[in-house]
């Protein structure tokens, strides 16, 4: 019984990693998968090198559609690989558990890939490598046992479990290192998973956990705030100085493919969302996330026949029948869509303008909101948020005149108007609701910020001002999300 203790400990540590630390990533990985038993539906995989093996590994990925089941499933596989590796190495009891270094290397590789794990490669590679090494180590163990007999000797004296201690150390470091170096990836995947179940509060909490959010986190944070009706009140609660995302140079280095379709959909731009998802399907082959996006977008555009075709294609994938049934009922009875709170919120932002996607600047979800002139109150708020994000004060002034007719101007908007009044004093007369306290607040910020306006080193600015002023448009306008082009202390563009 004692010889199984090292493997039980490894199982616990692998479970912590696969269910907890990296659980959201593996769960999202299942959304980047598509599998069907129909070889025609899987032709995009089968025609690739190792296509048949990837088809099998995509099937073996199916348990990952549940975070706990998938995490425990992976932990068991990794523990088996540990045991098989020990058998292959024919280690003594002192070294039981040292085989965990092999599965740890697979996980280290997965962590090192970052967003590339699903944005730039076959999504089933992790499972593929685990099963490949399981098969290899078991074959080697059998061959070695046939040709070499292990010498047995009584081990009476106590021996430190060196192998187990080494494995515990490497697995603990793996868990800690993954959270430190891949925090943004873990949180953004968790936000995408929560988006599927409309857990807006959970998405907002995740965004606030990030020490230095990337573009994916900022995008999903904006979606959640917009769905909660809090975009103009809380959009600057996170830092917009995005760290670079390391991607393989395949079809460009832009990480926006991770969130563009969702941003378009939740801006009530179903045609651009559909178009983007379709392009990704053509380039990468069918993926569950984009396939569901195309179903929702075609349904919102009342393309019932097209939606039915996609539903039939999705129904070939195991465990997706519930989603298929839901949208089949909605096609038969559109009122069901109108009663879905998520869809209701999306449709509240419907455009009154007829235009083409190319009529607006890219990305469309920002370009449309900057360019739209006739819109619902909810679209007006999203449009104002886009103007604030882009530091477009002319657009802020134009939209504020309409926004004040339906609600009190939010703090961020008032700050932007006071900033604009430095060059156009008449703005303060146009918006008498701007209080003296707001003017004093802006003046106080100007006094504290003036020594740093010409400074390119943002780290010193961050330390001096962010704690007090970070959650404000004032800090964002002068110091946040700025590119290298700065003229007279004013930011000329954003990321």
Regions found by a protein language model. Give the residues of each.
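N-terminal membrane topogenic signal
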Residues: 1-11, 93-95
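Soluble catalytic regions of membrane-associated enzymes that act on cell-envelope
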Residues: 182-355, 363, 368-392
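Hydrophobic cores of alpha-helical transmembrane segments in multi-pass inner/ER membrane proteins
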Residues: 75-80, 131-149
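Transmembrane-helix motifs of polytopic, lipid-linked glycan transferases
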Residues: 75-93, 107-111, 141
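Membrane-interface coil-to-helix junctions
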Residues: 17-60, 64-69
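Internal/C-terminal transmembrane anchor helices
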Residues: 157-182
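Aromatic-anchored segments of alpha-helical transmembrane domains
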Residues: 15-19, 101-113, 169-176
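Juxtamembrane "helix-exit" motif on the non-cytosolic side of transmembrane helices
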Residues: 22-30, 108-122
